[in-house]
């Protein structure tokens, strides 16, 4: 998860944000399933990229020059930091804060393989 403050990129341009979300997904090595986006009135954008490995979402507040980004991936194939690096490069924030969470470890969920339709998981106590 990342927060970008003082962004100087076009935060209210849906096509721009969608295009760069797709590019960010490509940078991670993830498998893109679908991209959904919405522009809010009077301003603000949400774009969600559904991935075989999970998702990437971005929410913009142009009036605050603020962006929230979540990159949630399973397994070791994807490199989520590359998505953040790409978005940071095009949105040009003055300040960035990143929090990394390891999800599922305490539940024993282990991703065993990926398929075009998504990840196959098993519980470690099975």
Residue map of PLM features:
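Polybasic/polar functional segments that serve as interface/processing modules
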Residues: 1-126
